[in-house]
């Protein structure tokens, strides 16, 4: 067999495998693809008469109502008891039925939808799958099917660097919404680096009144223009930071979406912004000379400990 024929054989085999894979997953467009999807005959259409039924607590039910507002499920009200027809049941079940803290099962037939999970996290992720199914459906009509799903990886994260390019808290919330939609559960928040300090530390107010502001609109201009900082009220000032109240708000917003925020405080290197502000923490004792903390002075360790104490108080994450 010549090279041309070998290539055609390999190409044909590859296309055949892809085709078989796609045919097994017809009619569903969900990211990430659930572990198991079984298709049945028929379908179910969400109508103005469709209602949610659930055994979740009143507090959890209200939290879901608030979360779903503005989504394709936002118009579906919660009812007090199930009728068995034309409903979306959210069933918090025993772990012997659905195993895994983030696992869920969805069953759709002509009578309605049943979403089961042994944790509220599982219920939340099942709702993300329903939202994706609805957003890719015609007239809110879903195929009859059974989905059994759980994550392959326990850590599903996104890294967001707000030092080099600052994004306000509303942007961060939008990122969290997108992460939740795709069942991601960790935000690695890069809050400090040589290009800017972005978190309020009450013991060191100059970190946000000076080290959070650059006299250049573009990062590259700052990079080649001396890498200096300026006062917050300088007309050239570009940057920003999060107050501690902002941090608490974003952390709570993430928790409602079952996302843990892991803050990063850069040390001992990439610390030009700190050493420009507090040059006594550098080995030269001068601003704009060093990028690394001086480990030969006790002042450095006192500074880092004080910073981390405030950071730890703001973030419930296991890791900092």
Language-model regions, residue ranges each:
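Bacterial Sec-dependent N-terminal signal peptides
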Residues: 1-29
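Low-complexity, compositionally biased segments
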Residues: 5-8, 23, 69, 164, ...
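Generic detector of low-complexity/intrinsically disordered segments
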Residues: 9, 13, 17-19, 66, ...
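Contiguous, structured surface segment used for ligand recognition
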Residues: 22-155
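Feature activates predominantly on carbohydrate-active enzymes
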Residues: 97-303, 307-320
């Amino acid at each position: 067999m010549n090279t041309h024929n070998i290539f055609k054989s390999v190409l044909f085999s590859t296309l055949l495998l892809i085709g078989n894979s796609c045919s097994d997953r017809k009619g569903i467009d969900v990211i990430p693809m659930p572990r198991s999807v079984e298709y049945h005959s028929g379908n179910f259409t969400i109508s103005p008469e469709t209602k949610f039924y659930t055994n979740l607590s009143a507090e959890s039910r209200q939290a879901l109502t608030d979360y779903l507002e503005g989504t394709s499920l936002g118009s579906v009200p919660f009812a007090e008891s199930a009728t068995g027809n034309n409903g979306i049941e959210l069933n918090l079940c025993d772990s012997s039925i659905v195993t895994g803290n983030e696992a869920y099962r969805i069953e759709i037939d002509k009578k309605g939808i049943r979403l089961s999970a042994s944790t509220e996290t599982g219920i939340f992720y099942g709702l993300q799958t329903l939202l994706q199914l609805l957003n890719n459906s015609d007239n809110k009509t879903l195929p009859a099917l059974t989905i059994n799903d759980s994550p392959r990886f326990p850590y599903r994260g996104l890294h967001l660097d707000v030092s080099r390019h600052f994004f306000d808290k509303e942007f961060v919330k939008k990122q969290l919404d997108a992460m939740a939609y795709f069942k991601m559960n960790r935000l690695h928040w890069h809050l400090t680096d040589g290009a800017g300090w972005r978190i309020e530390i009450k013991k060191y107010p100059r970190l946000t009144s000076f080290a959070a502001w650059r006299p250049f609109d573009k990062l590259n201009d700052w990079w080649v223009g001396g890498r200096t900082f300026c006062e917050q009220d300088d007309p050239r000032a570009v940057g920003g930071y999060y107050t501690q109240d902002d941090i608490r708000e974003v952390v709570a917003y993430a928790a409602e979406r079952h996302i843990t925020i892991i803050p990063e405080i850069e040390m001992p290197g990439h610390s030009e912004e700190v050493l420009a502000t507090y040059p006594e923490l550098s080995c030269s004792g001068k601003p704009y000379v060093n990028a690394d903390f001086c480990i030969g002075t006790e002042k450095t360790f006192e500074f880092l400990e004080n910073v981390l104490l405030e950071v730890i108080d703001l973030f419930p994450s296991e890791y900092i």
